[in-house]
Amino acid sequence: MTQDGTWSDESDWELDDADLADLAEAAPAPVLAIVGRPNVGKSTLVNRILGRREAVVQDIPGVTRDRVSYDALWNGRRFVVQDTGGWEPDAKGLQQLVAEQASVAMRTADAVVLVVDATVGATTADEAAARILLRSGKPVFLAANKVDSDKAEADAATLWSMGLGEPHAISAMHGRGVADLLDTVLKKLPEVAESVSAGGGPRRVALVGKPNVGKSSLLNKLAGDERSVVHDVAGTTVDPVDSLIELGGKVWRFVDTAGLRRKVGQASGHEFYASVRTRGAIDAAEVVVLLIDASQPLTEQDLRVLSMVIEAGRAVVLAYNKWDLVDEDRRDLLDREIDRELVQIRWAQRVNISAKTGRAVQKLVPAMETALASWDTRIPTGPLNSWIKEVVAATPPPVRGGKQPRILFATQATARPPTFVLFTTGFLEAGYRRFLERRLRETFGFEGSPIRINVRVREKRGAKRPGRR
């Protein structure tokens, strides 16, 4: 080991089993979505899977007001269980809203459990959701809930008619059958979330932003000006809510364009589903084009959508729309707003556009390509540790508790987004981690992509490993 604490021999860069376990935890876990009509027991099932009371459970349809995700562990397997949100149903809009929920789930989850009340049987809404899920190509499991009697057992058997295979008879309230259901699900659930695994086909783009910011206008401009909406690409299954558009000589998949085109107020629950669809579009995308109204001050809504994007870890392009309405005074104010409000996303490329006039819209394509290239980037372990050695020698970590922590070793655990794990002898202050991120960007680029830095505290090989922080 060198004096500054980094490893000098490349043989020391090989990871032991404990290190590999740390790296596995850095990879995004697969997502299991729990979907179904209101009051069929979705949140009760989530709580049963988690082994603790997390999801709000009341005997009132629509009590879940948003899509909520929880980290879960079953027989040593990590995964994320997603409690899809409820709504205030009415007789007219119920079927459409259940279908909407299933549509979001099938694009953002790696597997789906459809929960049906066995004592009621398959309703029209249940069957509509089943049809959508069958088209998704994702693993789908049917949970026949509220099976607490012999009669309910017989009722569950009638659900074979839904075409989803064997109905798994469960009682989320009492735990019956849930373990067997999970064992079956985990056999089909991938080890890592598919959203971050390399795959073929067009790159996935989400246009997001607050209402009336110009998402639909931009989509129409991109599709209409190019005269190149693609309906059939070999080997590609297209979700009805997506659009394939050729831009810059390649085909891009714009996710959830049906959500952009639908008129506000067309169905009950639209305000709730505006939020759900935004989250769903971000989760389904690889790169997010975040539209901001350049002619108006930044709002809380802008910042909420921005938080969703950062949390999801997607590549990002900031599109300042309505630039045709911006005068010199507004430009000065906007620059100050960006410096003050968007400090956490300075790494995103900014493109000033007008969806209405078409100004600079073509510049979005190279910005998206740059962001995706950064998002996909992997730094080999050798160059990464050589870089760490130079940085630490010039600027060591600050002393903490009378001791100076040393960075022993660094590796990139995953791409999409680039996630780095630093093995250290002590905790690194948040300020020093931000410093390392800045230096990473200066050296390796990463324009348009978030970077995640995780710290694992350990001693030199052969020493007792302290707890993680």
Swiss-Prot record:
GO biological process: ribosome biogenesis
Domain named KH-like: residues: 377-459
Family annotation (SUPFAM superfamilies): P-loop containing nucleoside triphosphate hydrolases
One Gene Ontology MF term: ATP hydrolysis activity
Alphabetic keyword roster: GTP-binding, Nucleotide-binding, Repeat, Ribosome biogenesis
Cystine bridges: none
Binding site for GTP 2: 209-216, 256-260, 321-324
Sequence ranges assigned to domain EngA-type G in this UniProt record: 30-193, 203-376
Chain residues that bind GTP 1: 36-43, 83-87, 145-148
Organism domain of life: Bacteria
One Pfam assignment: MMR_HSR1
Chain's role: GTPase that plays an essential role in the late steps of ribosome biogenesis.
HAMAP family on file: GTPase_Der
Family designation: Belongs to the TRAFAC class TrmE-Era-EngA-EngB-Septin-like GTPase superfamily. EngA (Der) GTPase family.
Subunit relationships: Associates with the 50S ribosomal subunit.
Name under which the protein is recorded: GTPase Der
UniProt organism field: Mycobacterium marinum (strain ATCC BAA-535 / M)
GN (gene name): der
